[in-house]
Amino acid sequence: MRHYETMFILKPTLVEEEIKSKIEFYKEVITKHHGVIETSLDMGMRNLAYEIKKHKRGYYYVAYFKAEPSMIVELERLYRINEDVLRFIVIKYESKKEVEAWHALVDRANKKPSHAKEKHEKTEHTHSHHTEEAESVGSHSE
């Protein structure tokens, strides 16, 4: 399975129940095609960068998932035929570096420290520990 991110923007005229229904529909599309949703971000109503179909605002939703490439065609088709979807994008993460970035985004969305950040913190902790030892040795020699 490959790593993907999808974001879609729904019309601002939808009521809360309709928004939840649309979100659940797209989540089910992913899971019914043997995809695994790692995490998602419900970003809520936001201003659009520019007007789309006479709308200045839209409801944003992002999902990070793993799926087979064949499922993406169906997901994009369903986005296109739904009049309530103003815009959508599906991003595929391919290279090792991109997959690491995908994991970092998932960790951030889940409010966990990312793998890269943990490595940095361990290095920083070791460095500060050595600095403290050096300072304490220097103060004893006076």
From Swiss-Prot:
The reply to whether Ubl conjugation figures as a keyword in the UniProt entry is no
Superkingdom of this protein's organism: Bacteria
Q: Which GO terms describe its molecular function?
A: small ribosomal subunit rRNA binding; structural constituent of ribosome
Q: Does the keyword Ribosomal protein apply?
A: yes
Q: Which residues form a coiled coil?
A: none
PROSITE patterns assigned to the protein according to its UniProt record, in alphabetical order: RIBOSOMAL_S6 (PS01048)
Q: Give the record's keywords alphabetically.
A: Ribonucleoprotein, Ribosomal protein, RNA-binding, rRNA-binding
Residue ranges with Basic and acidic residues bias: 110-133
**Annotated spans, Disordered:** 110-142
Pfam hit, one = Ribosomal_S6
Annotated GO CC locations: cytosolic small ribosomal subunit
Q: Name one GO biological process term.
A: translation
Free-text function comment from the UniProt entry: Binds together with bS18 to 16S ribosomal RNA.
Q: Which family does it belong to?
A: Belongs to the bacterial ribosomal protein bS6 family.
- Name assigned to this protein: Small ribosomal subunit protein bS6
Organism, per UniProt?
A: Helicobacter pylori (strain ATCC 700392 / 26695)
